[in-house]
């Protein structure tokens, strides 16, 4: 056993012990701890900003893009927003102990199915240090211990944020080891985390497709896939074109670097002449680079010829792949071929078309006459989320507090025997 493997197993063992102590704690105890964390973030803002500045300076030296540097950067205002988000989690209902269903059996036994924590959750994520706090707060509220493995590009930031959280927990009833960083910057530590079966109950990767696929392919621990969003908007032949244009622009440009932004626009041939010239002009004015098929390029010669790779790409930028289709079924076939199963939208005034699209498209969220940008725990009214699950087990769609639990059955009898 290497030193790195030994270190990873040590933190996982401590997390397992902490999870056992955390699981039975009351909501008051957990909320008290989260309030202490939020207060500590505000009190130690200067220290957090200083640590983050080291990461940002190193990122610039390494030639990281400005978009990635923006994700990495923590300002006093952003730290305040992170602390506010922790307070919002305090206000959310505690899912632990919730009775999912219950009944009295014919033999008189009382049966209840109740929510319980998953146990130890490993979070593997890229260069967004706010995830350190968000993930820790959500896991604590749902009664889980958490092991955090962020990007090496945010190592200084994640280290100080984890220290802030742990020092805040030290004065509360929540065990300090309920929140730990996986030691080291090397990929070897990630490898050993992914193989800590029996100590870690589930891994949740947050980041790009490459990170997620690496974890899915190499982990011996159950994985919940989150985030990759090759989202589609289909403008049907029965669409209100003014409404469609508004939704297309919002889905792509309101915030292009997030997983629920649209990446491909599919337009029915029956309305292409009326819709595409307007849509292409307004998208271009908004700074969007269009990658289109031959029919799209016939409306605008400046459109970049689309390749097979474009249809499968999650750009996370002001780029959009555009294709003309001859039918709703052709749009669905395209989505089935290239979608990441995150969010797809249909714009139509035809109830029959909407019903068919909803029934045929197999994604975590399907929008009818609404922007893909609404796939979000907060927008759905669920509160904060750990990510958007694009798989079917154990959760699908926005993963809030209930999705960070499992269930167990409690059966109460009066001396019953079988």
Swiss-Prot record:
Gene3D superfamilies: Aldehyde Dehydrogenase, Chain A, domain 1, Aldehyde Dehydrogenase, Chain A, domain 2. It catalyses: L-glutamate 5-semialdehyde + phosphate + NADP(+) = L-glutamyl 5-phosphate + NADPH + H(+). Its main location: cytoplasm. It is found in: Cytoplasm. Coiled coil: none annotated. Keywords: Amino-acid biosynthesis, Cytoplasm, NADP, Oxidoreductase, Proline biosynthesis. GO terms for molecular function: glutamate-5-semialdehyde dehydrogenase activity; NADP binding. Pathway: Amino-acid biosynthesis; L-proline biosynthesis; L-glutamate 5-semialdehyde from L-glutamate: step 2/2. Its EC number is 1.2.1.41. GO terms for biological process: L-proline biosynthetic process. GO terms for cellular component: cytoplasm. Disulfide bonds: none annotated. Pfam families: Aldedh (PF00171). Belongs to the gamma-glutamyl phosphate reductase family. Catalyzes the NADPH-dependent reduction of L-glutamate 5-phosphate into L-glutamate 5-semialdehyde and phosphate. The product spontaneously undergoes cyclization to form 1-pyrroline-5-carboxylate. HAMAP family: ProA (MF_00412). This is Gamma-glutamyl phosphate reductase. It comes from Thermobifida fusca (strain YX). The gene is proA.
